[in-house]
Amino acid sequence: MPSTAASQLVAAKGGSFLVENRTPTEVFTPEDLSEEQRQMAATVAQFARDEILPAAEEIEEKKPGVLAALMRKAAELGFASVDIPEEYGGLGMDKTTSTLITDHLSVLASFSTAFGAHIGIATLPLVWYGSEEQKQRYLPKLASGEWLGAYGLSEASSGSDAMNIRTRATLSADGTTYTLNGEKMWITNCGIAGLYTVFAKIDGEKFSAFLIERDTPGLTVGAEEHKLGIRGSSTCPLVLQDCKVPAGNLLGEPGKGHHIAFNVLNVGRFKLGVACIGGARHALAHTIEYAKQRKAFGKAIAEFGLIQRKIAQGATQLYAAESMAYRTVGMIDASLEQLGDHASRSSREIQKCIEEYAVECSILKVYGSEMLTVVADELIATMGGYGYVEEYPAERFYRDARINRIFEGTNEINRLIITGWLMKRALSGDLPLLGAIKTLMDEVTQPPSLDGSVDMGEALARESELLAALKKIALFAAGVASQRFMAALQEQQEVMADLADIITQVFALESALLRARKLGRSGKHSAKVAADMTGLLADESVAMAEQAAKRVLAACGEGDMLRTQLAILRRLARFTPADSVGLSRAVARECIQAGKYPLQ
């Protein structure tokens, strides 16, 4: 369990970061890991170094058996068992440990994609919704790696629109067998899996899930796809032609498959964001290593300011993503702690604790995947022509990064989820967002005054002040959009996406700031670089939010009203910038000296 006392950590409501303030002791950070968790992280990292990276070329070339054997080896070490209860062959550990495994295994996207699918979307539906007989039969095999898992939801005509699947299931007259017909597309692990969780509509109407073994009559695995990235992972179509599935292999209740599909996606999105953090950390180390070795104009290019800016930008965004990820899993574990010990927790209760943080999961997915894209792109920029050559890892990082903005719901869909989910909770009264918006709207129509919400004598006071302003920008933009469009706001996708980006910057900056303040109180050397990265992030977050808010306001009004609203926005977003050149150089120096991400 986390070393920070459970009584200090707060299981805050999902999305409450917009309307509530937290203290550093109330949030979990990577520095709070217990000794047991650190040992697990070290074991996983060693496996990644000693087993995954040496096999990278063979995995990418799809050498038969290599990927599956390595996944089974990881499972033998317990990496596939953390989220599976002990009574079914698992370890039943906390979600922070599960997060660490995903984080530190993610040095090769082909492997992390395959293993992540196995331990996540292919296993958790069974853990949460399986009958006792189903769990006893399948979970020990999945935990040990004897069988690998795959998850079949997407179809050629229904990607993001998951409820529009065409695969049909028909129950036999005697009620013993379902016959499935349809085709699933882009199924990760399809070619190596022993068990498939497949979604179909019973009688063309009831959206349901089924557990299908590989040797089931009527199930055919199609040819491997030749992909832009994650080339070493198995991705195939799954064809169901009069596929006979025992009625006992229906997962959950008939017509309730959407609960399974959507709830497991929350974990999938969170874990994908975490995997992007691990991948970015590895890519940033390559950037730093090359920059230190490459000489130009008589010195290492790591000494040049523009290269240092690239390194600092990558480290700063990585720091923000990492802070969000461990803060989120800390809230999940704090919520689970309230349920009592592992044995007393029902699968439904665990699922509800995770579902509470659906918006944070979507935020991390979007931010993490786009952060990795930046880091991979700057690795190629740093390496120049070498970055385009397959002999070097940069081009693989670049190719592999793109899929993360598509997986687990595209980033466009997740942006709509972020804003839509918060508005839904606001309207239901689960989140006091509407009251906060009203208070802010009343405030901004009055002459400006100091609200006293920030103690300017505290550490990182400037960044705290910018965070307060950022929250006001988010509430102001959301309030204007809500008044303009009301219930029709969901139809304004561009506005929804811009609001999501502002909200994301709030969560990113607050998570980074709280972590930096917590480190500052510890007296550790790393506190300085954390503070510098938070300073860089604060300026960038407010600037990005202001631009997004301008687009929202312009879509909502015109003339004098728009000019008045823009004046209010300028007042909210007004700040004295930090010396970003100096901060970037300071952050880059720490990275270059460490030869890697400085908080690693």
What spans do the regions from the language model cover?
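Amphipathic, small/basic residue-rich leader segments at the start of a protein or domain
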Residues: 1-116, 133-144, 333, 337-351, ...
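Glycine-rich phosphate/cofactor-binding loops in nucleotide/flavin-utilizing enzymes
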Residues: 2-26, 100, 375, 385-460, ...
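Glycine-rich beta->alpha junctions and the first turn(s) of the following alpha-helix
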Residues: 3-4, 30-33, 39-40, 220-322, ...
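C-terminal helix-coil-helix/basic helical segment that borders enzyme active sites and/or dimer interfaces
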Residues: 56-61, 319-367, 380-381, 486, ...
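N-terminal glycine-rich flavin-associated loop
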Residues: 114-133, 159-162, 171-174
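A short, Trp-centered hydrophobic/proline-enriched beta-strand micro-motif
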Residues: 145-153
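A short core secondary-structure module
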Residues: 176-221
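C-terminal amphipathic alpha-helical interaction region
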Residues: 445-453, 458-600
